[in-house]
Amino acid sequence: MQTYAVYWNDPEGERCAGRVSLGPSFAELNGGTSQGQLRSLRLGFEEIASVRYQHGRLHLWRRNAAPLRLGSADRPGALRELAERLKSQLAAAVA
């Protein structure tokens, strides 16, 4: 499973750093806060309404929850690559 180093804000607004992994039917965020609290969030592809890479951020709009914005802590171009892979897997899941 390919993983990417990212940062994001959790639902409480706290900044998290960790990784995102793409599974066959989900994207999973695992990481922690600056206070050492672990955070994990699994998003089924059916929960994701749309994906857009813009201004160096990956925007994930969810059907029934607030959108997520991810930033890269990985190599240059990794977030754009993640966006393309996620869009491709979402399209395949819908088909």
Where are these regions (language model features)?
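Acidic, Ser/Thr- and proline-rich intrinsically disordered linker/docking segments
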Residues: 1-17, 22, 28-30, 36-95
